């Protein structure tokens, strides 16, 4: 009887009740090496406190400032609170993916690692504001690494 009670208690704590998904469209600033507009989207799914996300973003080059364009796609693992606390759901994430950087005729592409975090703020119903910081370490041939990005976006939870 005690083993059954312990097993049921354990399964109740670790088994996900329901998966949640969300999509974010964002705009922000890439601060490396100069401030330039960046934009993109992210699609994710969460299971209690662990989530998975795919993101794509792009930043245009500024030849006069010597700032390369940067495009990347990244898969990440998120650790987040299972529910919003006072309308705020903080998260931490880390991931890896591929990037492409270009400045004039010079191009570089390769593997990138990203780490960051942020908060999803409840607005109305399933609509949330997402604020995020990301540090992205690019390959050894990159002109500007690590890249730092700050953004805000509209997030729809479903």
Each model region followed by its residue ranges:
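Gram-negative (and chloroplast) outer-membrane scaffold detector with strong preference
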Residues: 44-113, 121-125, 129, 150-158
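Sec/Tat signal peptide C-region and signal peptidase I cleavage site
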Residues: 15-21
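A short acidic/glycine-rich loop-to-helix N-cap element
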Residues: 140-145
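Short amphipathic alpha-helical segment that frequently serves as the phosphate-/nucleotide-binding helix
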Residues: 36-41, 74
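Short N-terminal segments immediately surrounding and downstream of signal-peptide cleavage
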Residues: 22-37
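Sec-dependent N-terminal signal peptides
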Residues: 5-14
């Amino acid at each position: 009887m005690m083993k059954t009670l312990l097993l049921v208690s354990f399964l109740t704590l670790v088994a996900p009740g329901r998966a949640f998904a969300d999509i974010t469209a964002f705009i922000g600033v890439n601060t490396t090496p100069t401030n330039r507009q960046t934009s993109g989207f992210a699609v994710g799914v969460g299971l209690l406190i662990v989530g998975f996300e795919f993101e794509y973003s792009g930043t245009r080059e500024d030849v006069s400032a010597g700032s390369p364009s940067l495009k990347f796609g990244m898969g990440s693992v998120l650790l987040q609170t299972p529910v919003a606390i006072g309308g705020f759901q903080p998260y931490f994430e880390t991931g890896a993916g591929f990037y492409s950087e270009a400045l004039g005729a010079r191009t570089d592409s390769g593997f990138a690692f990203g780490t960051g975090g942020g908060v999803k703020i409840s607005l109305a119903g399933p609509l949330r504001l997402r604020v995020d910081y990301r540090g992205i370490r690019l390959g050894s041939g990159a002109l500007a690494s690590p890249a730092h990005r700050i953004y805000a976006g509209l997030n729809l939870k479903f």
